[in-house]
């Protein structure tokens, strides 16, 4: 399968990319910075999740899209609530729209265990809102999806 991983230069994305590559999938990584861990055979596209043209280039031709691009630091999200909305919600909606346009078979979203708690501040709010959008895209537009709720990931 052809797989695109947004946020693929990060801790989680880079490990998922490597595992998928080992299993024979064609992996395209899309991130705001070039991956330090890019493996042989993986394609790298550098761009911002909010740049629709670059995001579309990353998604076009993919069978599956893993959405790992996020403002994932809880403290940073508290200091930058607008960025948490732009990246975690708007970035996800832009990705969903392009997945529909290019007939992506499955959308996999990295969320957080905080969505059902009172912890996590704006990070929690943005991840919960993104999950709500994903569920509505499934109901209204039929996109197949998986939501993964991770705990804290230490590097």
Ranges and model annotations:
Residues 3-23:
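N-terminal Rossmann NAD(P)H-binding glycine-rich loop of SDR-like oxidoreductase domains
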Residues 6, 30, 65-69, 107-113, ...:
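SDR active-site strand-loop-helix element
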Residues 18, 92-93, 128-135:
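Conserved active-site helix of classical SDR/Rossmann-fold NAD(P)-dependent CH-OH oxidoreductases
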Residues 25-34:
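Conserved glycine-rich Rossmann-like NAD(P)H-binding loop of the short-chain dehydrogenase/reductase
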Residues 41-51:
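Rossmann-fold cofactor-recognition segment
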Residues 49-86, 98, 114-117:
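NAD(P)H-binding glycine-rich loop region in Rossmannoid oxidoreductase-like domains
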Residues 86, 90-128, 145-146:
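Conserved Rossmann-fold NAD(P)-dependent oxidoreductase catalytic core, especially the SDR/UDP-sugar
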Residues 112, 132-155:
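Conserved beta-loop-beta element that borders a ligand/cofactor-binding pocket
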